Amino acid sequence: MVRPLNCIVAVSQNMGIGKNGDLPWPPLRNEFQYFQRMTTVSSVEGKQNLVIMGRKTWFSIPEKNRPLKDRINIVLSRELKEPPKGAHFLAKSLDDALELIEDPELTNKVDVVWIVGGSSVYKEAMNKPGHVRLFVTRIMQEFESDAFFPEIDFEKYKLLPEYPGVPLDVQEEKGIKYKFEVYEKNN
């Protein structure tokens, strides 16, 4: 079964997503709660959502918050020989992770698949054929960054006018404005 892939990311105006292994902006509690809700809440009883992330993204999560709770966590790494402490699975590549999900043991447990970073994992997911959604929080300010979100190809990806559970209005926390957007491609 080919499942839609969902990438979720917060980006600054200069497309920054990270700085020194952390977020480039101060912690935004409501934005973080949106991430938690979107990636955790499953619409199917008895199933869990699954998050896929690169090794650096995994280690950027404070240890007390690893694994991301109430979600199946897959870490991607070509170097690691076994899943890092707390991770449920390790895969060498995104393709391997997606194959793993189709394993009979996992396939019936997984509802929605979320890609949560970093840059190269997002890029690979965005270039995959098929149904891909991008849940983008647009932080309406520039922040110095050393990790960036790949360019969105607007020929392929269309901005949806609305999406269930995604607020439409501009949000503000700590003097920082941001808005939630959802893009989709289906080819």
Swiss-Prot record:
Record's keyword terms, sorted: Cytoplasm, Methotrexate resistance, Mitochondrion, NADP, One-carbon metabolism, Oxidoreductase, RNA-binding
Enzyme class, broadest EC rank: oxidoreductase
Domain named DHFR: residues: 4-185
Annotated GO biological process: dihydrofolate metabolic process; folic acid metabolic process; one-carbon metabolic process; response to methotrexate; tetrahydrofolate biosynthetic process; tetrahydrofolate metabolic process
Binding site for NADP(+): 10, 16-22, 55-57, 77-79, 117-124
Residues that hold substrate according to the record: 31-36, 71
Alphabetical list of Gene3D superfamilies matching this protein: Dihydrofolate Reductase, subunit A (3.40.430.10)
Compartment list: Mitochondrion; Cytoplasm
Coiled coil spans: none
Pathway assigned to this chain's UniProt record: Cofactor biosynthesis; tetrahydrofolate biosynthesis; 5,6,7,8-tetrahydrofolate from 7,8-dihydrofolate: step 1/1
Superkingdom in the source lineage: Eukaryota
Enzymatic reactions: (6S)-5,6,7,8-tetrahydrofolate + NADP(+) = 7,8-dihydrofolate + NADPH + H(+)
An example Gene Ontology molecular-function term: dihydrofolate reductase activity
PROSITE patterns noted in UniProt: DHFR_1, DHFR_2
CC annotations in GO: cytoplasm; mitochondrion
Pfam families per record: DHFR_1
EC number per UniProt: 1.5.1.3
Similarity comment text for this entry: Belongs to the dihydrofolate reductase family.
Function statement: Key enzyme in folate metabolism. Contributes to the de novo mitochondrial thymidylate biosynthesis pathway. Catalyzes an essential reaction for de novo glycine and purine synthesis, and for DNA precursor synthesis. Binds its own mRNA and that of DHFR2.
Subunit structure: Homodimer.
Name under which the protein is recorded: Dihydrofolate reductase
UniProt organism field: Bos taurus (Bovine)
